């Protein structure tokens, strides 16, 4: 990867493999650090002779075909190595054995273990544990397939983004031009590019003619950059004589020598940097892991306690082991895995409808816990198309609308000066609308030409009608295209107005250069001499527009006198035979890539949600700061150090940096900063703009934010954003303007490229976190009425009140739909007004949730179930005290004369029917108390009466679980299949008082929380 390999020293021997295969990880880290460094190359400093010596290329004939073939064999094809993709089967296994699924697998294995112990020791073992094991395995496999399918669907959409067009490149070999596949281009090749081509490799330009390239995907500059053979800057990314792989040539032609191909290009290094970064664990995965620890802890603690207890109570070892396994399995919430998966999927679908495509389900929640967003400027915060913002004519600044439909244009369009200015802007302009777009709105039409000229073309077309007709009336005779030495563009046209001279010369260019060529100025349609006062007015206007971060162009014209330039005069542009001085200055037009309409509002929402928005851009500081102020990243009244210095009229060095809330950091300063200095900036400034940053620096900024403990979202569209996208906790790429590399690296894609969609994402993410809490609280509560019957069965030696099969009916049957319905619950308060959650303290499942679900609501539910159990047995003659210690006889199939409290004798078959009826009734009681639990889980702080019952899915869930319970109880044949028996209608009502008690208890608890915020009740029970 070392960059300064002089190619003259590049003997094949130097390409030996790494000698030592040891320390592979260390090497990888070293490579990553190497990639994070700035680009170092020296080809831009070499003279043409030195280039010829280094690459052995004839500068007019190119390489020989034989030499090219040799180099191709040595270096490999000129293509980026695709990032290593995870094989599908590994992705599938991750779904099957990741996190929560492991808990269920362990449960299933324990069940099979228990069953095999029973099968080995009993003559007619019960099949409950076998069923349970099979069901648990099935649950994991089905939910695994489901989430795998969800993610595979997103990656299918990803595949469709890949543009499979094989690129062609025009090379010169053996002195002949030939078009070859771009992958066959080799180092040392002589390549020609013209407007509209993609640059096939990193080129050192040796000759150019009006060549401009669009580097925005690499550096983030929205303006096309001039390319010429001149060495203009030490930094290879800034110099004019290097053109980069995969950027686009927008106009002109150039010829260059290939200096790097494939992965060794600047673009290739960035792509490699992105694919080599490991993304960390998502916040929701960490939460689920934390939750599993809690549940496992509770399960093992209960299991071991009762294992010891059952040994003390003189059960056999085998029985005690069966109990241990039973308790651990009873603690596993079987339905929860499916619930969480479905909730995340629903949110992902909801986000897709709002133009956010989520690539992996866990990223859905990450956006909700985001505390810092690092956003790219070009194309994300702005529209990525230059638009005319202001004009200066008649000695005053006029505003053009920069809204996306340009509705704000309200200046005097009848002024003679404006007519002259618009005429120059339309004629001295090579941009044209592409064919067949007459029925599209002007601003939506595609233009062939560079960004500034397109902006002028659209502006003039909007204000003055068809530019094409204007150009036909004023036919062009000759032109001098823009070049970097004289910094102007000029053309001479036939003038159709008979009252004026025949030829009109129009010129545009850098304002100070244009003004130097003028001796008069047009004011209100009259020419006046250009005096010092007007020059000052020009200077002030120029500075004001430049200070707004706008790109300013000057315009002037001259009517060529007929006596010197009669009709048919031969104008010569090489040996100029017409005046290019003493022209008449007409005005200035300034352009900017304006903010998207919805962005300021979105930034405001982020700020009120406690999210810090940082702008990270490759563009110039002045432009970056202007846009940051325009969209509210630097808010009204907040000053940078430079602003304070200017206001107090003191040097910048005397200002205390802590006084400035806002801060604009230049990439070159960032280069020399230590991590500590960067941390200081991130800590002490609330509003930050990083300008002129390289891709490597974007990555360093993200790492800096993460060191502060922030959860970072990064938005971007260029290749230059991809390393940062990959490193961030959640990378957000742009769907329309985004490059393939950035889409690969991101976790989420904004299909409409609109920054405002991120706010929607944050809102959905926060909502799903709240709703998952509610869902989990609901699901866990029924664990207590499921476990306690088993514990009492062991301790008090009573007939088993609730069987394994019935537990499954609750977890995978009646509780599923209600738990999922909580995902549709609306937010209780304004989610977007609170601070982001602290991942260290604000957990998905915390001790308070467990204590509320298990210790409070769950206990009331268990009481309801036992009450029903004792009522049914008492109605059948077994009073509660008589049941103590009855278990051994009750479960013995050879004893057929067990007596009840009234002396009646019961056979084994009869006893079991009563027991199974009790199981069914206990099950129904749990359903009844879960009604109340579902309703109270709708809110965590508000009263249910404030929240209302608008959630239709939840109401459906209530009816669905009741209907399912009734079906399981009364459907003929259930006695055989699930050992469920029909109940007397009165037995349904046993648990009603407990259901009501739960509702009242929780409403009172929430009332106290609302009345006494921060009090004891809130600290102990608010999850």
From Swiss-Prot:
Keywords: Acetylation, ATP-binding, Cell membrane, Cell projection, Ion transport, Magnesium, Membrane, Metal-binding, Nucleotide-binding, Phosphoprotein, Potassium, Potassium transport, Sodium, Sodium transport, Sodium/potassium transport, Translocase, Transmembrane, Transmembrane helix, Transport
UniProt cross-references to Pfam families, sorted A to Z: Cation_ATPase (PF13246), Cation_ATPase_C (PF00689), Cation_ATPase_N (PF00690), E1-E2_ATPase (PF00122)
Residue spans, topological domain Cytoplasmic: 6-87, 153-288, 339-772, 824-843, 939-951, 1007-1023
N6-acetyllysine modification, residue list: 9, 21
Region (Disordered): 1-38, 216-235
Membrane topology (UniProt): Multi-pass membrane protein
Positions of ATP binding: 487
Region of interest: Phosphoinositide-3 kinase binding: 82-84
Bilayer-crossing regions: 88-108, 132-152, 289-308, 321-338, 773-792, 803-823, 844-866, 919-938, 952-970, 986-1006
Cellular compartment(s): Cell membrane; Basolateral cell membrane; Cell membrane, Sarcolemma; Cell projection, Axon
Biological processes, Gene Ontology terms: intracellular potassium ion homeostasis; intracellular sodium ion homeostasis; potassium ion import across plasma membrane; proton transmembrane transport; regulation of sodium ion transport; sodium ion export across plasma membrane
Gene3D superfamilies tied to this protein: Calcium-transporting ATPase, cytoplasmic domain N, Calcium-transporting ATPase, cytoplasmic transduction domain A, Calcium-transporting ATPase, transmembrane domain, HAD superfamily/HAD-like
A GO cellular component annotation in the UniProt record: melanosome
GO molecular function annotations of the record: ATP binding; ATP hydrolysis activity; metal ion binding; P-type sodium:potassium-exchanging transporter activity
Residues that hold Mg(2+) according to the record: 717, 721
Enzymatic class: translocase
Known function: This is the catalytic component of the active enzyme, which catalyzes the hydrolysis of ATP coupled with the exchange of sodium and potassium ions across the plasma membrane. This action creates the electrochemical gradient of sodium and potassium ions, providing the energy for active transport of various nutrients. Could also be part of an osmosensory signaling pathway that senses body-fluid sodium levels and controls salt intake behavior as well as voluntary water intake to regulate sodium homeostasis.
PANTHER family with a match to the protein in the record: SODIUM/POTASSIUM-TRANSPORTING ATPASE SUBUNIT ALPHA, SODIUM_POTASSIUM-TRANSPORTING ATPASE SUBUNIT ALPHA-1
Protein name: Sodium/potassium-transporting ATPase subunit alpha-1
């Amino acid at each position: 990867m070392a960059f300064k390999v002089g190619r003259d020293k590049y003997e094949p021997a130097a390409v030996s493999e790494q000698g030592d295969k040891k320390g592979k990880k260390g090497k990888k880290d070293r490579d990553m650090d190497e990639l994070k460094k700035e680009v170092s190359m020296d080809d831009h400093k070499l003279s043409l002779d030195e280039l010829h010596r280094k690459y052995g290329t004839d500068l007019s004939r190119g390489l020989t075909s034989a030499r090219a073939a040799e180099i191709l064999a040595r270096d490999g094809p000129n293509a980026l190595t695709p990032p290593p993709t995870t094989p599908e089967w590994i992705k599938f296994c991750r779904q099957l054995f990741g996190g929560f699924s492991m808990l269920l697998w362990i449960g299933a294995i324990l069940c099979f273990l228990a069953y095999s112990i029973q099968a080995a020791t009993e003559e007619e073992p019960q099949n409950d544990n076998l069923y349970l094991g099979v069901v648990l395995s099935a649950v994991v496999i089905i939910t695994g397939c489901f989430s795998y399918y969800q993610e595979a669907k997103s990656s299918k959409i990803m595949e469709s983004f890949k543009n499979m067009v094989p690129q062609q490149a025009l090379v010169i070999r053996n002195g002949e031009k030939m078009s070859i596949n771009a992958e066959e281009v080799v180092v040392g090749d002589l390549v020609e590019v013209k407007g509209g081509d993609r640059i096939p490799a990193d080129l050192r330009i040796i000759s150019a003619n009006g060549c401009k390239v669009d580097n925005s995907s690499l550096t983030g500059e929205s303006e096309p950059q001039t390319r010429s053979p001149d060495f203009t800057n030490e930094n290879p990314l800034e110099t004019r004589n290097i053109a980069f792989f995969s950027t686009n040539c927008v106009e002109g032609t150039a010829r260059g020598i290939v200096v790097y191909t494939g992965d060794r290009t600047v673009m290739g290094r960035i792509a490699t940097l992105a694919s080599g970064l490991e993304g960390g664990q998502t916040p929701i995965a960490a939460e689920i892991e934390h939750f599993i620890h809690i549940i496992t802890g509770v399960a093992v603690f209960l299991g071991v306690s009762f294992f010891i207890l059952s040994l003390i109570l003189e059960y056999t070892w085998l029985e005690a082991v069966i109990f241990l396994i039973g308790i651990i399995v009873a603690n596993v919430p079987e339905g929860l895995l499916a619930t969480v998966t479905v909730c995340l999927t629903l949110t992902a679908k909801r986000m897709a409808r709002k133009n956010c495509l989520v690539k992996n389900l866990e990223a859905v929640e990450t956006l909700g816990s985001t505390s810092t967003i690092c956003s790219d400027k070009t194309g994300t915060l702005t529209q990525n198309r230059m638009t005319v913002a202001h004009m200066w004519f008649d000695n005053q600044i006029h505003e053009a609308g920069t809204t996306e439909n340009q509705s704000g244009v309200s200046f005097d369009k009848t002024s003679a000066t404006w007519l002259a200015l618009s005429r120059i802007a339309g004629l001295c302009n090579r941009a044209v609308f592409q064919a067949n777009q007459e029925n599209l709105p002007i601003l939506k039409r595609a233009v062939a030409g560079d960004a500034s000229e397109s902006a002028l073309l659209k502006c003039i077309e909007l204000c003055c009608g068809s530019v094409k007709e204007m150009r036909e009336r004023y036919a062009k005779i000759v032109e001098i295209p823009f070049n970097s030495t004289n910094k102007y563009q000029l053309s001479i046209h036939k003038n159709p107005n008979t009252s004026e001279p025949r030829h009109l010369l129009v010129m545009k260019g850098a304002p100070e250069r244009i003004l130097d060529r003028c001796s008069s100025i047009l004011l209100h349609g009259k020419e006046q001499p250009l005096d010092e006062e007007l020059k000052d007015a020009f200077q002030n206007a120029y500075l004001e527009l430049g200070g707004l971060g706008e790109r300013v162009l000057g315009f002037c014209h001259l009517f060529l006198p007929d006596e010197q330039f009669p009709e048919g005069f031969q104008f010569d542009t090489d040996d100029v035979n017409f005046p290019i001085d003493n022209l008449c200055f007409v005005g200035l037009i300034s352009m900017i890539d304006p903010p998207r309409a919805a962005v300021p509002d979105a930034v405001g929402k982020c700020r009120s949600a406690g999210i810090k928005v940082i702008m990270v851009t490759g563009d110039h500081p002045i432009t970056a700061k202007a846009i940051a102020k325009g969209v509210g990243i630097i808010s009204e009244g907040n000053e940078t150090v430079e602003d304070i210095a200017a206001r107090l009229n003191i040097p910048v060095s005397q200002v205390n940096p802590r006084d400035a809330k806002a801060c604009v950091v230049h990439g070159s300063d960032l280069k020399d900063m230590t991590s500590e200095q960067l941390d200081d900036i991130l800590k002490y400034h609330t509003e930050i703009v990083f300008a002129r940053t390289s891709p490597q620096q974007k990555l360093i900024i993200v790492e800096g934010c993460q060191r502060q403990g922030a959860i970072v979202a990064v938005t971007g569209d260029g290749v230059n954003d991809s390393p940062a996208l990959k490193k961030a906790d959640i990378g957000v790429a742009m769907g329309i303007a985004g490059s393939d590399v950035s889409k690969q690296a991101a976790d989420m894609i904004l299909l409409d490229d609109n920054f405002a969609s991120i706010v929607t994402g944050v809102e959905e993410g926060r909502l799903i976190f709240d709703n998952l809490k509610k869902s989990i609280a609901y699901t866990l509560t029924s664990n207590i009425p499921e476990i306690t019957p088993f514990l009492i069965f062991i301790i008090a030696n009573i007939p088993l009140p609730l069987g394994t099969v019935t537990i499954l009916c609750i977890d995978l049957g009646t509780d599923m739909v209600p738990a999922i319905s909580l995902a549709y619950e609306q937010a209780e308060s304004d989610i977007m007004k609170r601070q982001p959650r602290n991942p260290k303290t604000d957990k998905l499942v915390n001790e308070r949730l467990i204590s509320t679900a298990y210790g409070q609501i769950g206990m009331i539910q268990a009481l309801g179930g036992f009450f029903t159990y004792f009522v049914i047995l008492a109605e059948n003659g077994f009073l509660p005290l008589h049941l103590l210690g009855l278990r051994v006889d009750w479960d013995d199939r050879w004893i057929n004369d067990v007596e009840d409290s009234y002396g009646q004798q019961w056979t084994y078959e009869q006893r079991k029917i009563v027991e199974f009826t009790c199981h069914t009734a206990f099950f129904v009681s749990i359903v009844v108390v879960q009604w109340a639990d579902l309703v109270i889980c709708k809110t965590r702080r508000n009263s249910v009466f404030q929240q209302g019952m608008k959630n239709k899915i939840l109401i459906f869930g209530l009816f669905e679980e009741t209907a399912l319970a009734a079906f399981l109880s009364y459907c003929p044949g259930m006695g055989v299949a699930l050992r469920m028996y029909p109940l007397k209608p009165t037995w349904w009502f046993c648990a009603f008082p407990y259901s009501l008690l739960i509702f009242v208890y929780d409403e009172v608890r929430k009332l106290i929380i609302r009345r006494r915020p921060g009090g004891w009740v809130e600290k102990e029970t608010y999850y």
